[in-house]
Amino acid sequence: NLEDYSIFWQVLKRDTAENLMHILFVASKLDDIDNYLDIVRQSGLNPVVVDVRCFATRNALALREDLTKSDAPVAIVEFGAFENYILILYKDSPFISDIYLSEKDRNTLMDQDSTDEQIKGISNRFSMQVSQMISSYTAKYKTGSINSLLISSSMPNLERTIGNFNEALPNVDVEVFDTLL
């Protein structure tokens, strides 16, 4: 029974000529996870189970019927101090790619006293990578255009960056995506 497992998968490569797909498939039996938790508890420790952020984001997106019912791909960007990636979902197939953000830029984004000019420069560099990844994805997988970009972040300066993302990605509707709602 599939409900007994926590499952994630991603198509890594499609070979239409050979009618083959390379797939990354990760699954954990929920009972096994519970057994390991019991062992840790018996040793006197209090374990905490955390859903990997990109999995949690994907699970939160499943609750947004306005986006998941569409035939268009949906892009979610994690813009944070520790993780930066784009997750593109199309017909239930996830595609995940890392986005580079330097340590200096991370520190600037975390600093409430950073200037609008600093934030804009970082946002523009980040947006350029997002734009390139979206273009590469739509060209490689022959999908329609991506019109909606959801940004998930724990950064204190997120509201200051949304306008910059909208400016840098004029053909995409950018909105904050709160995975906790």
Question: Where in this protein do the model-derived segments appear?
Answer:
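Hydrophobic/aromatic-enriched cytosolic interaction surfaces used to assemble or bind macromolecules
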Residues: 1-181
